[in-house]
Amino acid sequence: PYIGLPVFLSRAFRHGAIYVRKASGITSPKDLEGRVVGVPEYAMTLAVWVRGILSDEYGIDTDKLKYRTGGLNEPGRTERITLNIPSHIELEDLGSSVSLNDAILDGRLDAIISPAPPQSFSDGDARVIRLIDPAGPIEREYFKRTKIFPPMHIVGIKKTTIQKYPSLPNDVYKLFLDARKIAMERVKEVAQSSANREMSPWYSEAYEYAVSIMGAEYWTYGLDNNSADLQAFCRYCYSQHLTSKLMSP
């Protein structure tokens, strides 16, 4: 068992993480109900956030999606935790020989929910399109309204290690706070430097735009700074049958 620290090493808005087979006729999020949707793992953080957003923002009953799990571009991925999903939810493994990308191209899937695009989309295959496109304006409006910048990954320390070194969680947390400060200063420095050190032509503009909407400290650690995010995630885990009771951060 691990103890989690409120240190969020990865965060991302996820409205743009839904890809659909163009011929499926899916043109809005509500159309996903009753359709066959691929996802690398039902319990992965990305999937939890997307289902939560679909429910909160679009009124979708995500239990009505027909889930197929598997590797995105390479077959064989399986759930890493044991699930206790109600029988009314259709959840099946694609198996060891078919990827989600294969399945959306051959018609077995109507859509894919994934943190990275399927290879067909990356290759410009017109048969696979992003459902919410462009996602950026909707994600920015979502943040302005909810103040949620979805956390993806956190830092964990083994309970046995903490038992040996009780001060370790606070010590590690302080180190990550220091590292975050350095990282944010570097991001600002690069954005405002006279020479572009990022291979992105509008990096400075993107940074300034993010700050104008989210504030200079847009990538925060700690429970108080992320209460809306964590409360939403706990609620999603419970409503999606991943926890037996409603947890609190």
Predicted segments with their positions:
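Residues within well-ordered alpha-helices
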Residues: 28, 50, 99-100, 233
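Short, solvent-exposed beta-strand edge segments and adjacent coil->beta transition regions
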Residues: 34-35, 152-154, 216
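Pocket-lining segment of extracytoplasmic ligand-binding domains
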Residues: 78-188
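Residue-level marker of alpha-helix boundaries and capping positions
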Residues: 41, 90-91, 223-225
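Short, glycine-/small- and polar/acidic-enriched structural segments
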Residues: 1-63, 67-76
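A local structural motif
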Residues: 59-94, 243-249
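Secondary-structure end/capping motifs
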Residues: 156, 161-239
